[in-house]
Amino acid sequence: MAGPSRAPVKKQASLTSFFTANISSKKHANSPGGGSAANRNKDETEDENTQKIIGKGKEKDESSPITLSVLESNRKRPLQDNNSNGNGRSSRAAKRAKSVVSEDDSEEVSSPPVQASTGRTPIPEPPSSSSRTERYAYDADRLASDPSGLNEDEDAATRRKKEELHRKFVKKLGHPDSLASLRRRELLGQNESPGLDGEGEEEGGDAEEDETPLPSKTKKKGAKTGKLTPMEIQFLDIKRKHMDTVLVVEVGYKFRFFGEDARIAAKELSIVCIPGKFRYDEPHIDRFASASIPVHRLSVHVKRLVAAGHKVGVVRQLETAALKKAGDNRNAPFVRKLTNIYTKGTYIDETGELDQPGEGAGASAGGYLLCLTESPVKGLGTDENVHIGVMAVQPATGDIIYDDFEDGFMRREIETRLLHISPCELLVVGELSKATNKLVQHLAGSSTNVFGDRSRVERVPKSKTMAAEASSHVTQFYAGKVKGDDERSASLLDKVLKLPESVTVCLSAMITHLTEYGLEHIFDLTKYFQSFTTRQHMLINGTTLESLEVYRNATDQSEKGSLLWALDKTRTRPGRRLLRKWIGRPLLDRERLEERVTAVEELLEHQSNFKVDRLGGVLNSIKADLERSLIRIYYGKCTRPELLSTLQTLQRISIEFSRVKTPEDTGFNSSLIVEAIYALPGIGTIVSAYLDKINPEAARKDDKYTFFRDDEETEDITNHKLGIAAVEADLDVHRKDAATKLSKKTPVTYVTVSGIEYLIEVPNTDLKHVPASWAKISGTKKLSRFHTPEVMRLMNERDQHKEALAAACDNAFTDLLKSIASEYQPLRDAVASLATLDCLLSLAQVASLPGYSKPTFLPTATPPTISITSGRHPIAEHTLPDGYIPFTTSLASPSPLAQLITGPNMGGKSSYVRAVALLVLLAQIGSYVPAEAMSLTLTDAIYTRMGARDNLFAGESTFMVEVSETAAILRGATARSLVVLDELGRGTSTHDGAAIAHAVLAHVARETRCLTLFITHYQNLARVADGLGGAVRCVHMRFEATGRQRDEAADGDADAAAADADEEITFLYEVADGVAHRSYGLNVARLARIPRRVLDVAARKSREMEEGVKARRLRGAVRLLEDVVAGGGGGGGGGGGDGDDGEDPLEHLVSSIEQL
């Protein structure tokens, strides 16, 4: 039972008390006479039956427990026991602590007593069963005589109290989630709310406890945050500064998640989340929800969280147990600090990276972190043309791409760059226009987007003076890196200062952003700054990448079935990344292109030679991702086993080519191969110098203590090792002292049990000899194990030396990484050379396939030309079981500049034009092509308008997408571009679509004069070809029609329609001159298993419409013939002008007759 309190205690009322008419006052606590005047007045109003039963005066009733019991049963209302000291305590306090419904019999309702009762004996407590039954009885007579139940002095105070209790009741149990909240408290083992027992609470404690604490660092008295552990408070301090980060906190031998982070981790990692509060201001729960993972699985789980799109922070303990015990803060929690932050674009801490091919259908993104900023172009609307600056960084390789350009309202330019770069994370500086913002959300927001995975988007504000601030920030960043007359540093700063303003803004934002991750030093490598729009490469926009399936197929967005999949025979990861760049950026520099093709040719000719086999063997032996390992060394994030593997791999490569002293020693003639091989032996000296410092066995086992050879250890490492040796020697000497105390003649022997070292075993029969100062650690039935005070002291000293040694070893390893990072440039050049050799060998392997030939590049002065003999689709021939039917075609200026391609549905028109475009692309990346022969001039861009799709995110219909892409082509195409237009105009009515197709074909043939492949089902466009002076050539995809012929059935009857429906088409997939006047759509409908009745109706309607068109053409031809005859007869004696006027109608007549 709790002792009496020194102050009046404010207690939580029972839930049942809220339903009584009034709570009785304490009759005898406020006056020496046993009750207040108000109470005596109330007693005088008792009914007559009560007075008869009592049979005595009021004073006697108060002192008789039996009479009191009878009184309570008849009064039918609560009655409080007398309590002379007013402390509000009774003998039933223990029972109240176990029940929420039970209540203290002496609960204080009115104001505290002014004077304690003296000389009155406390009344014994009635039996609890009758008390619970009778104390809440309802007395209607009492209400009739005194509706308030209180005197005037107590009325206001009691009303306030009851209103406060009612408010608490409604707050706790008056909402739909109240029962669920109680169940969760039961689940947490909190069957009783703190504060219901009323013990030790201060005035106003209840009200504060029920209120939700504000998320501030100051803790209210009685608030739940006051019950957090010191470690949880430490977690909150870090979380407040990183609210957007999932924190993984090191706690002993585990890493733990707390609060909302635990729920996220449980969902993404499929681990258990222990229930608790998910927010630090959540009421009624005094501990956080949590989840945990083992220390050795940290990298695996962090990688999974990052891949899911989360920003993850790792909070580590910066103190060890031994050093903390020896320090001044031994009673404080471990010091913890946020040491690492990871996102998709900055995660490079493990050898298994995020951009490796995944298990899903979609290929992964390119590993770039892309920053973009936008500003409106002066004089235009806010959503029209905009000026955009972009900078993309690949932290794992050190590559940096930047660009500055103006974009139209369709945002084709920024879309092209996003599709080329495929960023896994975007940093948006400032506000974006509505159109740009929708594009970014569309490309990055879906888990099945064109990037292959959901991309993370982060936004930072942009001030009005951002340009000036960015310039100053970038200048200061690089100014500290310029050292005296260092020419390299000076050129670095000069190159950065020449960047466009919008790119400088992006660079400043990226420096600030990557500083948080410790990766800002990547911008020191300005050698790898590349402009996206340098005219050394062919322009391939985003639409073309998708239409030609360059990186991903159009079916499931996976890499299989793409051009990259068909060409990728690389052996190393740096080689694969370089090949991807080559495919996306074909060359325009003829000299570089010839150099690359010549290298592929030489490797192909000597593919069975020892030299080529050795190159392949060296590349096959490279298992590590050297490019990423080097950048991890540069960042200081490399592990010891990885460092050993990287250095040994580089040494093995240098030894393999150690005999190469001059370019002639390489054994190749191609300058590209010679330069690549000649760069490899030079790294041998650098790598060997660092390997000589390392103990290979220790590095392989990740043993930091013996990682360095003895003569390469630092002074700190040596001192701490000597200190450990000295302590261990003292422990050995101490064995004799221990034996002396145990009355033994021979020194005791230390044993290790369950990881506890230096235990002294003593048989239980000899325990009488053990000094009292020895600490028993463990034991069995026969013996006990002890630590002496000296052993404990020496072990603590040894542990301190060990932990200091570990820190010294880590510092020495960090210094070694910094030293290797100073040699990053030559090592990176060597890895780049290996990647080049890998790509060339891959292209040579492709060239060795049957039917591949070397393309011939025509002189620059030659008019635009593409000539292909027996060409094949480079992707389809690998996927089709029966192979691909070759085609022969040519485009040339002045004629034929364009081809008008017709043919039946599914006849191979789209496959043919894609094959031509892909062969041009292959030729200009330096690859052999699947054709008997191919000659071409360099093409500066490939534009495509293929397929039918809408653009909901931009509010564009299918036809709007068609004409918008066509407009962009007409604006950007030059005389040296290749344009592919597939069924332009099909998104609108026949007349409008044919008119647009007519106009566009005429424009590209007469105005732009670019090489064009134009697919259409509008056969009347053949007239345009005839009227363009041979610039357009009509071709069609050959086919054979079999089955009942139309002339076998009577015209217009059902048999004729059935003949159309039954007619079968055999596709020959060959290109031939001429126009196909029918598309045979019913044949495709039949292959798609359209119901027979529907096909019959469609055939009949098709025949009716076709005959109607023929009839109109025939009538028109007759009228035209009459006009020609009439004009010829009337104008026989006229001048030459009449003859000229008659030429056009005559030609029109001939064309009409041909179409009949």
Curated annotation (Swiss-Prot):
PROSITE patterns: DNA_MISMATCH_REPAIR_2. It is found in: Nucleus. Pfam families: MutS_I, MutS_II, MutS_III, MutS_V. Residues 225-345 are annotated as: Mispair-binding domain. Residues 198-212 have a biased composition (Acidic residues). Its main location: nucleus. Signal peptide: none annotated. InterPro entries: DNA_mismatch_repair_MutS-lik_N, DNA_mismatch_repair_MutS/MSH, DNA_mismatch_repair_MutS_C, DNA_mismatch_repair_MutS_core, DNA_mismatch_repair_MutS_N, DNA_mismatch_repair_MutS_sf, DNA_mmatch_repair_MutS_con_dom, MutS. Coiled coil: none annotated. GO terms for molecular function: ATP binding; ATP-dependent DNA damage sensor activity; mismatched DNA binding. GO terms for cellular component: nucleus. Residues 82-91 have a biased composition (Low complexity). The keyword Lipid metabolism does not apply. GO terms for biological process: mismatch repair; mitotic recombination. SUPFAM superfamilies: DNA repair protein MutS, domain I (SSF55271), DNA repair protein MutS, domain III (SSF48334), P-loop containing nucleoside triphosphate hydrolases (SSF52540). ATP binds at G903, P904, N905, M906, G907, G908, K909, S910. Keywords: ATP-binding, DNA damage, DNA repair, DNA-binding, Nucleotide-binding, Nucleus. Residues 132-144 have a biased composition (Basic and acidic residues). Residues 1126-1137 have a biased composition (Gly residues). The keyword ATP-binding applies. Heterodimer consisting of MSH2-MSH3 (MutS beta). Forms a ternary complex with MutL alpha (MLH1-PMS1). Belongs to the DNA mismatch repair MutS family. MSH3 subfamily. NCBIfam families: PRK05399.1. This is DNA mismatch repair protein MSH3. It comes from Chaetomium globosum (strain ATCC 6205 / CBS 148.51 / DSM 1962 / NBRC 6347 / NRRL 1970) (Soil fungus).
